[in-house]
Amino acid sequence: MRPDIKICGLKTPEAVDRALKRGATHIGFIFFEKSPRYIEPDLAAKLAEPARGKAKIVAVVVDPTNDELDEIVSLLKPDMLQLHGNESPEHVLTIKALYGLPVMKVFSVRTADDLKRVEAYIGIADRFLFDAKAPKGSELPGGNGISFDWSLLSWLDGSVDYMLSGGLNKDNVAEALFVTKAPGIDVSSGVETAPGVKSVAKIDEFFDAVEKANAPMMASGS
């Protein structure tokens, strides 16, 4: 079974169109002003229109205020909120209650210790996303184009729904899927020519690589 595929940090209609044509299950818009992938909520709403009913629209936020979330949810009408900050389990529950939307909680990973917090969110977050921990000095919590040791996720069983992120690209996504059997994958910098500049050709190459990697898994029934 092919994993869910999320193309994140979209900013142009061409990139959205190609992601949808290639079968992206999720498209992500980033509302963190320090990111080169930042987009205004009203523009994101226009770009998201062709995706409605075809792919889940994900709003990516980092420790947002209620006012910021109000504006994003009102304009974009996302299918899911991706929380990429330091939101506590209690705060996640509050956000879910306020907006009636499922939440994907992000964990930044470098060592096994970074995963100890996950258990507190099981049954609270609807899905997890595991990304590489940002290098020292980086202002960006994600989208840094670096990977982590995927074997750290070996303790996860089928009851934990998650997406794998962090430096995925056409050259390493097959190995990532082989090691983790991740039910979902998330790519941003791996389909760019420069930070925030999505490449239609690179989106194609990424999907081609996933489909090639998935073929033997389908044949073996994995």
UniProtKB/Swiss-Prot annotation:
One Pfam family of this chain: PRAI
EC supergroup of this enzyme: isomerase
Keywords: Amino-acid biosynthesis, Aromatic amino acid biosynthesis, Isomerase, Tryptophan biosynthesis
Molecular function GO terms recorded: phosphoribosylanthranilate isomerase activity
Record's catalysed reaction(s): N-(5-phospho-beta-D-ribosyl)anthranilate = 1-(2-carboxyphenylamino)-1-deoxy-D-ribulose 5-phosphate
EC number: 5.3.1.24
Pathway note: Amino-acid biosynthesis; L-tryptophan biosynthesis; L-tryptophan from chorismate: step 3/5
Gene Ontology biological-process entries: L-tryptophan biosynthetic process
Taxonomy, superkingdom: Bacteria
Matches recorded under NCBIfam families: PRK01222.1-1
Family of the protein in this entry: Belongs to the TrpF family.
Name of the protein described by the UniProt record: N-(5'-phosphoribosyl)anthranilate isomerase
Organism whose genome encodes this protein: Rhizobium johnstonii (strain DSM 114642 / LMG 32736 / 3841) (Rhizobium leguminosarum bv. viciae)
